[in-house]
Amino acid sequence: MGLWDSLLNWLRSLFFKQEMELSLVGLQNAGKTSLVNAIATGGYSEDMIPTVGFNMRKVTKGNVTIKIWDLGGQRRFRTMWERYCRGVSAIVYVIDAADRDSVPISRSELNDLLTKPSLNGIPLLILGNKIDKSEALSKQALVDQLGLESVTDREVCCYMISCKDSINIDAVIDWLIKHSRTAT
């Protein structure tokens, strides 16, 4: 980014606040709450308590305020996903890339979510988490196994991350900032 772009971004940040609302979904133990903590504080804890229902957290990065709905991934909470995904700036779907047995279930739940008419066109960010583990899938394997090439009704992006080792968390934040909107 050149000096002119930096100056322009600084001027924008003085006059325009950006905001976004996103829903963080995925199966239990995928690392959704760990991702919220990594984005908010850069911190990581091995002793994470499973989310019951949902948690909401606001995080400010630069001039962007991100309202994050962290939704429980247990089967009994998955019916809530659609309700909390309506009208958001983006849907972030987190997958444990090292738990290969859970990928078919993740694919099924993701496909079910994407068929909801109320969610048409909302950008989708897929995050393959836990790439610090040797058994983690590659990005291409995850894209293939989730069938992401067939999703054509919305923007789809996929990053492989590690909340534990802070791998690609900055890229996720950059993607989120680019998908925020000016507050009116």
Curated annotation (Swiss-Prot):
Binding positions for GTP per the UniProt entry: 29-34, 48-51, 70-74, 129-132
Domain of life of the native organism: Eukaryota
Keywords annotated in UniProt: Cell cycle, Cell division, Chromosome partition, Cytoplasm, Cytoskeleton, Endosome, GTP-binding, Lysosome, Membrane, Mitosis, Nucleotide-binding
Disrupted gene: phenotype observed: In the triple mutants arl8a-1 arl8b-1 arl8c-1, impaired multiplication of tomato mosaic virus (ToMV).
A GO term, aspect molecular function: GTP binding
Keyword hit for Repeat: no
One GO CC term, this protein: plastid
Pfam families: Arf
GO biological process per UniProt: cell division; chromosome segregation; defense response to virus; protein transport
Subunit organization: Interacts with tubulin.
Record protein name field: ADP-ribosylation factor-like protein 8c
Annotated source species: Arabidopsis thaliana (Mouse-ear cress)
